[in-house]
Amino acid sequence: MTNRLVLSGTVCRTPLRKVSPSGIPHCQFVLEHRSVQEEAGFHRQAWCQMPVIVSGHENQAITHSITVGSRITVQGFISCHKAKNGLSKMVLHAEQIELIDSGD
Protein backbone atom coordinates (compact mmCIF):
# COMPACT_ATOMS: atom_id res chain seq x y z
CA MET A 1 0.00 0.00 0.00
CA THR A 2 1.27 3.45 -0.87
CA ASN A 3 1.42 6.09 1.86
CA ARG A 4 3.45 9.14 0.75
CA LEU A 5 2.82 12.81 1.33
CA VAL A 6 4.84 15.83 0.20
CA LEU A 7 3.71 19.09 1.80
CA SER A 8 5.32 22.52 1.81
CA GLY A 9 4.43 25.40 4.04
CA THR A 10 5.39 27.51 7.02
CA VAL A 11 6.12 26.26 10.52
CA CYS A 12 3.43 27.85 12.71
CA ARG A 13 4.20 26.35 16.15
CA THR A 14 7.47 26.25 18.05
CA PRO A 15 9.19 22.88 17.56
CA LEU A 16 9.02 20.68 20.66
CA ARG A 17 11.98 18.35 21.19
CA LYS A 18 11.80 15.22 23.34
CA VAL A 19 13.74 12.02 23.82
CA SER A 20 11.79 8.80 24.31
CA PRO A 21 12.60 6.43 27.20
CA SER A 22 14.40 4.24 24.65
CA GLY A 23 16.65 7.18 23.68
CA ILE A 24 15.04 8.07 20.34
CA PRO A 25 14.92 11.84 19.70
CA HIS A 26 11.66 13.33 18.44
CA CYS A 27 10.84 16.82 17.18
CA GLN A 28 7.21 17.90 16.77
CA PHE A 29 5.83 21.02 15.10
CA VAL A 30 2.87 22.15 13.00
CA LEU A 31 3.18 23.00 9.31
CA GLU A 32 0.68 25.41 7.75
CA HIS A 33 0.06 25.00 4.02
CA ARG A 34 -1.71 27.56 1.81
CA SER A 35 -1.97 27.34 -1.96
CA VAL A 36 -4.26 27.67 -4.95
CA GLN A 37 -5.12 24.35 -6.61
CA GLU A 38 -7.08 23.57 -9.74
CA GLU A 39 -10.01 21.20 -9.39
CA ALA A 40 -12.63 20.44 -12.06
CA GLY A 41 -11.39 23.42 -14.07
CA PHE A 42 -11.75 25.88 -11.19
CA HIS A 43 -9.20 27.46 -8.87
CA ARG A 44 -9.72 26.86 -5.17
CA GLN A 45 -7.90 27.86 -2.03
CA ALA A 46 -6.25 24.93 -0.25
CA TRP A 47 -5.34 25.31 3.40
CA CYS A 48 -4.42 22.99 6.25
CA GLN A 49 -2.37 22.77 9.42
CA MET A 50 -0.59 19.42 9.65
CA PRO A 51 1.18 18.15 12.77
CA VAL A 52 4.65 16.84 11.85
CA ILE A 53 6.91 14.52 13.82
CA VAL A 54 10.58 13.90 13.06
CA SER A 55 11.92 10.78 14.78
CA GLY A 56 15.40 9.31 14.96
CA HIS A 57 18.89 10.74 14.78
CA GLU A 58 19.07 11.04 10.96
CA ASN A 59 16.99 14.23 10.57
CA GLN A 60 17.48 15.85 13.97
CA ALA A 61 20.30 18.16 12.79
CA ILE A 62 18.02 19.97 10.33
CA THR A 63 15.31 20.39 12.98
CA HIS A 64 17.62 22.74 14.91
CA SER A 65 17.36 25.17 11.96
CA ILE A 66 13.54 25.08 12.08
CA THR A 67 11.73 27.88 13.92
CA VAL A 68 8.31 29.48 13.69
CA GLY A 69 8.16 31.11 10.26
CA SER A 70 10.56 28.67 8.58
CA ARG A 71 9.42 27.66 5.10
CA ILE A 72 10.01 23.96 4.50
CA THR A 73 9.01 20.98 2.37
CA VAL A 74 8.39 17.73 4.23
CA GLN A 75 8.18 14.26 2.69
CA GLY A 76 6.98 11.26 4.65
CA PHE A 77 3.99 9.13 5.53
CA ILE A 78 0.79 9.87 7.42
CA SER A 79 -0.64 8.03 10.39
CA CYS A 80 -3.26 8.66 13.08
CA HIS A 81 -2.26 9.41 16.66
CA LYS A 82 -4.76 9.19 19.48
CA ALA A 83 -4.68 12.23 21.78
CA LYS A 84 -5.15 12.12 25.55
CA ASN A 85 -8.76 13.25 25.03
CA GLY A 86 -9.42 10.15 22.92
CA LEU A 87 -9.68 11.98 19.59
CA SER A 88 -7.54 10.86 16.66
CA LYS A 89 -5.50 13.28 14.58
CA MET A 90 -3.56 12.76 11.39
CA VAL A 91 0.21 13.28 11.70
CA LEU A 92 2.88 13.54 9.00
CA HIS A 93 5.92 11.43 9.94
CA ALA A 94 8.82 13.22 8.24
CA GLU A 95 11.43 11.18 6.42
CA GLN A 96 12.95 14.08 4.49
CA ILE A 97 12.92 17.83 5.23
CA GLU A 98 14.12 20.60 2.96
CA LEU A 99 14.43 24.26 3.94
CA ILE A 100 12.94 26.57 1.28
CA ASP A 101 15.19 29.51 0.49
CA SER A 102 13.33 32.73 1.28
CA GLY A 103 15.29 34.60 -1.38
CA ASP A 104 16.54 37.25 1.06
UniProtKB/Swiss-Prot annotation:
Residues 1-101 form the SSB domain. One of its GO terms (molecular function) is single-stranded DNA binding. One of its GO terms (biological process) is DNA replication, synthesis of primer. InterPro entries: NA-bd_OB-fold, Primosome_PriB/ssb, Prisomal_replication_PriB. The keyword DNA-binding applies. Coiled coil: none annotated. Keywords: DNA replication, DNA-binding, Primosome. Homodimer. Interacts with PriA and DnaT. Component of the replication restart primosome. Primosome assembly occurs via a 'hand-off' mechanism. PriA binds to replication forks, subsequently PriB then DnaT bind; DnaT then displaces ssDNA to generate the helicase loading substrate. This is Replication restart protein PriB. It comes from Escherichia coli O1:K1 / APEC. The lineage of its organism: Bacteria, Pseudomonadati, Pseudomonadota, Gammaproteobacteria, Enterobacterales.
